Amino acid sequence: MVINLRGTSGSGKTTVVRGIMAKGEVVALEGTTGTAKKPEAYALDVNGLDKPIRIIGSYENVCGGCDSISTQDEICRRIEVYAHQGHVLVEGLLMSHLFSRYAMLDRKLFAMGIPFVWAFIDTPLEVCLNRVRARREARGTTTPLNVKNTTDKWHDMRRVFDKCVKQRESDWKKVIGYKIAKLDARWVSHENAVEEVFGWLS
């Protein structure tokens, strides 16, 4: 199973991943010492799971995930490679607002018998904004937050959810090579997201 956590800044995507990482033994794939690059992914083994978990991206910084990966194609390549090794957990701010590229990946993996879950975290906008403000204060940023970008992205994410479930022809024009389908899109409770997402893997 591939689980793509989606949410705007401050929604808790990275917090969910770190919560799941805390449930087992984590090994970085592609070393991080010296001048070596950041990890390509992490291997997570959890007692009781039938498959290992692969977590895409780097979690060396406070805000982890895939946003430091250079292209969406590279993210998709890693997802596809690691999906053949076990479960995959992936998140990032940029990918949270994209549909067509990941609908194509969804359908490609589905044809191989690998489920793809679009997991949208239901964090209220004001909570997201407050968390972003807190991060800025922790960094020493004193200028007021321009809320427009986070607000716009919060609404964009909801539009992507609609595209997943409403099967509109206009939304699928750029999903090249695949027929319109209802995708497995789910809302995740921001208050219990770690246990809810982990439960899908158990």
Please place each PLM-identified region on the residue numbering:
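Walker A (P-loop) ATP-phosphate-binding motif of ABC ATPase nucleotide-binding domains
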Residues: 2
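Hydrophobic anchor at the beta1->P-loop junction of P-loop NTPases
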Residues: 5
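Conserved glycine(s) of the Walker
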Residues: 10-12
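A conserved segment at the C-terminal end of the G1
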Residues: 14-27
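Switch I (effector-binding) loop of TRAFAC-class P-loop GTPase G-domains
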Residues: 24-48
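Conserved nucleotide-sensing/catalytic segment adjacent to the nucleotide-binding pocket
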Residues: 39-100
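Conserved phosphate-donor/acceptor-positioning beta-strand/loop module used by diverse small-molecule
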Residues: 91-92, 112-134
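NTP-dependent small-molecule kinase module
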Residues: 163-202
